[in-house]
Regions:
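Basic (Lys/Arg-enriched) interaction patch that binds polyanionic ligands
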Residues: 38-75, 81, 269
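Charge-rich, low-hydrophobicity low-complexity segments
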Residues: 1-46, 88-345
Length: 345
């Protein structure tokens, strides 16, 4: 007997049943014996990730240990309870793919709602004239005429799914996209028996689109205790719970929170889409530290630091601020017009 799962994951026995767990727990270190890891699930590593290893997961990744000279990539959020040294961390790759799909989809759901109403009118008008116009033929005429853009968008959606792999998207979204693409391409013309059938496809596609947009409302974060000489990218926040970030390159779409008691951000380059709070920014000796706060977030304390050392260069709303002397209690922000609000500089 052969069993096929509807989702990817680890099969486990539960009495007379077989359950596929989309959350996999690995007890031990990821090292030479395990090799690299690539799973389409959430992965929890109850250990460390050793030098040279690559770990890629489609959903969330948790490492209950340290990461040394490794590459970690999560479609969702990424958490490391220990320190990360000379490593690359990526979180939110799945969200980037979802954005790509939604961009290809464009306004297709709204356009299709208009198409369904137009098909209904065309069929009704033909009936009033004593003629019979199948809904599928009316739809085909619209797809080859004024609504050819709908067909183009759905072809782009299919191309995105093919390029990234169907496993990167919810199964329902892929099924809805395939069903609509099949119909608007004219391949399902004879299968379309009524306008209600078309509207049902459109509603399903719109529901899946809404679900995908909901995913983007919760950007993926990176959370760890300590970063040294790392390259970090996250669509959401970066949260540091330990001593800080040193000589690293940071790109986060959300906030940067360095929460340790006397946490430090020193050396390297940080690009932040939201707010940034840190105890100590820069270090002794005046070594250069670059911080870019991108976008036009309106807040008087978008950058807050207890101590800022000389050599720190901050760009906020395209305004450059260079710290040449030691400053304490620094808060920088912007007003509604995007103008700089230095409270202490």
């Amino acid at each position: 007997m052969h069993l096929y799962a509807a989702v990817d994951g680890r099969p486990t026995h539960a009495g007379a049943m077989v359950i596929v767990e989309e959350r996999i727990t690995f007890h031990g270190d990821i090292g030479v014996e395990t090799g690299d890891v690539d799973v389409n699930a959430t992965l929890v590593v109850m250990g460390s990730v050793d030098e040279g290893r690559e770990v890629r997961v489609a959903h969330d990744l948790e490492v209950h240990g340290d990461v040394d000279r490794a590459h970690l990539e999560a479609g969702g959020s990424l958490t490391v309870t220990g320190s990360c040294v000379h490593s690359q961390l990526r979180a939110g790759g799945r969200q980037a793919v979802v954005r790509h799909l939604l961009a290809a989809l464009g306004s297709t759901s709204e356009d299709l709602a208009v198409v369904a109403t137009t098909v209904e009118h065309m069929v009704s008008s033909a009936r009033d004239r004593g003629q019979q116009l199948p809904p599928g033929r009316a739809l085909l005429a619209l797809m080859e005429g004024p609504y050819a853009g709908v067909r183009t968008h759905m072809a782009e959606v299919e191309a995105v799914i093919d390029a990234h792999g169907a496993a990167m998207f919810p199964e329902g979204a892929v099924a809805a996209a395939h069903a609509v693409s099949h119909v608007v391409a004219g391949l399902g013309m004879h299968e379309l028996t009524g306008v209600d059938q078309l509207r049902a496809l459109i509603v399903t596609l719109a529901d899946q689109e809404h679900a995908l947009r909901t995913q983007l409302a919760d950007p993926s974060a990176v959370r760890t205790a300590y970063l040294q000489a790392c390259d970090v990218e996250a669509s959401g926040d970066l949260v540091i719970t330990g001593s800080g970030i040193f000589n690293s390159t940071i790109f986060v779409g959300g906030d940067l929170w360095v929460e340790g008691g006397r946490s430090t951000l020193r050396g390297g380059h940080a690009i932040v889409g939201g707010a940034m709070h840190v105890h100590e920014l820069g270090g002794d000796g005046g070594a250069r530290m670059d911080v870019e706060l991108q976008g036009r977030t309106v807040t008087p304390d978008r950058l807050r630091a207890d101590v800022v050392h000389p050599g720190v260069h901050v760009t906020i709303n395209e305004y450059p601020v260079v710290f040449e002397d030691l400053r304490q209690g620094v808060a920088l922000g912007a007003d509604e017009e995007g103008h700089l609000l230095p409270q202490a500089a």
